């Protein structure tokens, strides 16, 4: 008998081999840290009866029967979040199917709720606050660029050619591009671009943005030494240069990547691993960015609105798809309903 048959196989202690209660008992401390650090809400926090004697790390093994937006309805997340109506959970039957567990196609190691991406994130609230401030600008914010940008005779002021921005009485030094005449601050102390109107929080971000308005014939444009492609934005050129240094190669298909984490994400296409799962509908994704884009479909914040039918979308790509397929084609056929009488003479 070969010697390999005499070797005793050791059964590893994994979540797949252990019972579910003990597995969640060992992992509850890690889950508790993720709940606190990443801002997860009450979707995974259950009553203390789940683990007897341990009320702090009491976690549910599936979706909570409480509504996903209970914290937002109670107003614990601020007035901006509590003022929006909570959207309905797309698939509530998942909470009761199979004993309360989400049945996905692949094993999901992390589950995310839409609240963790959007309601706890301040970007949506800041965007709404800036929109309100732009609709009704204060006199102080309007007078600030005039006092700094042109013509004043006081000390420390410059002509309109410099256009340096000021915020709160202090001068913010802008780059060479920002001093070209559009460094004035708009509503809320943000730096506005004089060509396209976009606003930025810092003058350095404005200077980086102004590189995109350069012409390809400009002296500041740079050419890639490998392929000869011309770039007017230096950050974009730096990202392009990485595409010529593909040192991380896939051992399965031979595809090469510039960074190791790109190769790691590519390997999931061979293994079928989808570790990022949606806590609302159970759909799993191989990449976190795809999950983040999917989460916007469950969000109450839909900022992209169709100009024709006033239907709103969470993603701009969804709005563009709506323009191409539904709204404008359907709208063109709608007003053209009296067109068949015009076609009848042609057909005759």
Swiss-Prot record:
Zinc finger (C2H2-type) stretch: 191-213, 222-244, 248-270, 276-298, 304-327
GO CC entries: nuclear body; nucleus
Family: Belongs to the snail C2H2-type zinc-finger protein family.
Swiss-Prot/TrEMBL keywords: DNA-binding, Metal-binding, Nucleus, Repeat, Repressor, Transcription, Transcription regulation, Zinc, Zinc-finger
Record field: compositional bias (Low complexity): 130-148, 163-182
One Pfam assignment: zf-C2H2_6
Localization of this protein: Nucleus
Quaternary data: Interacts (via SNAG domain) with LIMD1 (via LIM domains), WTIP (via LIM domains) and AJUBA (via LIM domains).
GO terms, biological process: negative regulation of transcription by RNA polymerase II; regulation of neuron migration
Domain remark in the UniProt entry: The N-terminal non zinc-finger region mediates the repressor activity.
Record region (Disordered): 130-190
Function field: Transcriptional repressor that binds E-box motif CAGGTG. Appears to function downstream of proneural bHLH proteins in promoting neural differentiation.
Major localization listed first in the record, in broad terms: nucleus
Protein name per its UniProtKB record: Transcriptional repressor scratch 1
Region (SNAG domain): 1-20
């Amino acid at each position: 008998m070969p010697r390999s048959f005499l070797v005793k196989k050791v059964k590893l202690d994994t979540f797949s081999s252990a019972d579910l209660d003990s597995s969640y008992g060992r992992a509850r401390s890690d889950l508790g840290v993720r709940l606190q650090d990443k801002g997860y809400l009450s979707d995974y926090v259950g009553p203390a009866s789940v683990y007897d004697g341990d009320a702090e790390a009491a976690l549910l093994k599936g979706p909570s029967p409480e509504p996903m937006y209970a914290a937002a309805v109670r107003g614990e997340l601020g007035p901006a979040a509590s003022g929006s109506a909570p959207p309905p959970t797309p698939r509530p039957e998942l909470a009761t199917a199979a004993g309360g567990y989400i049945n996905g196609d692949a094993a999901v190691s992390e589950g995310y709720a839409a609240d963790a991406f959007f309601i706890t994130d301040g970007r949506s609230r800041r965007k709404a606050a800036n929109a309100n401030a732009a609709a009704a600008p204060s006199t102080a914010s309007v007078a600030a660029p005039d006092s700094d940008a042109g013509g004043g005779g006081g000390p420390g002021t410059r002509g309109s050619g410099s256009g340096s921005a000021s915020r709160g009485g202090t001068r913010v030094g802008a780059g060479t591009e920002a001093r070209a005449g559009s460094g004035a601050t708009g509503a809320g102390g943000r730096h506005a671009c004089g060509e396209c109107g976009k606003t930025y929080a810092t003058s350095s971000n404005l200077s980086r943005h102004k590189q995109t308005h350069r012409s390809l014939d400009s002296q500041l444009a740079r050419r890639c030494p490998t392929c000869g492609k011309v770039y007017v934005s230096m950050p974009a050129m730096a990202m392009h240069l990485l595409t010529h240094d593909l040192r991380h190669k896939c051992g399965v298909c031979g595809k090469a990547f510039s960074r190791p984490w790109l190769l790691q994400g590519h390997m999931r296409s061979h293994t079928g691993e989808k570790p990022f799962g949606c806590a609302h509908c159970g759909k799993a994704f191989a990449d976190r960015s795809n999950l983040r884009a999917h989460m916007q479909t469950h969000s109450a914040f839909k900022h992209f609105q169709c100009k024709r039918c006033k239907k709103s979308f969470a993603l701009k790509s969804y709005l563009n798809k709506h323009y191409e397929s539904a709204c404008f084609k359907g709208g063109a056929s709608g007003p053209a309903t009296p067109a068949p009488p015009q076609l009848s003479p042609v057909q005759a």
